[in-house]
């Protein structure tokens, strides 16, 4: 039996969540990292809405968004590892922000953010005047984000449609009902999503995206390895220090033999560009320190375009 087999899963068919529990709570953790980055001296990204969304979930979450990472003052190694995790979140966010900017520059005015969580791109990016952004996620997660931002007078920078549906269900039908136009090229985003889907659901997701995509559509994907050790350690510290009881390892699917995302897309008509997260972190001035290499998360960041007629 492998270490992966020994982890008891907290997931079940048809499970759901609010923003402070299960998979939903990981969106708060990611938003906290964006808040930390935004408060830095030379931020790679700016998300002024992240602190609002995180602090509204309670004082423990607000502490997690503390740019000084004061809750780890007596743990220098933990503080460095957490800072590295925030750097990674900043780099992947920057990658996807640039992706949407390039898509808009190419005349693509329809975007779909899968498992949107507390993603605020519909509010904070510079969208073309006719842009339409669809956000797909669990109903209570979308409701939390919309209510908090509305209560602070925040309005979207594009026409935004929240599509409240589980990605394991018939989300294409819900997307079409919300006004999605399958004849227009689309910029798709699957960021921080794939580990929370079973392998067969990941394949179906890509099949549905491809079926809904007009020529010239694009997609950006964050593809994970099965080794999430560094990420696990960060979440364990959050639990132990802040009382945030999140077992991220038990929330992800780690079955062997999952289809490689880049390979699947390339085999189905997409032209794929990929870069390792560590290469991208080094390029942007956030390299992984040598003594933290074994604890750092490893992912591949993908961009792909669909140029052929099917």
From Swiss-Prot:
Molecular function as annotated in GO: methyltransferase activity
Pfam families per UniProt: LCM
EC id: 2.1.1.-
Keywords of this entry: Methyltransferase, S-adenosyl-L-methionine, Transferase
The keyword Hydrolase appears for this protein: no
UniProt GO BP: methylation
EC class: transferase
Signal sequence extent: none
Top-level taxon of the source organism: Bacteria
Ligand binding (S-adenosyl-L-methionine): 137, 166-167
Function of the molecule: Exhibits S-adenosyl-L-methionine-dependent methyltransferase activity.
Record family assignment: Belongs to the UPF0677 family.
PANTHER family: S-ADENOSYL-L-METHIONINE-DEPENDENT METHYLTRANSFERASE YKTD-RELATED, S-ADENOSYL-L-METHIONINE-DEPENDENT METHYLTRANSFERASES SUPERFAMILY PROTEIN
Name this polypeptide is given: Putative S-adenosyl-L-methionine-dependent methyltransferase MUL_4763
Species in which this protein is naturally found: Mycobacterium ulcerans (strain Agy99)
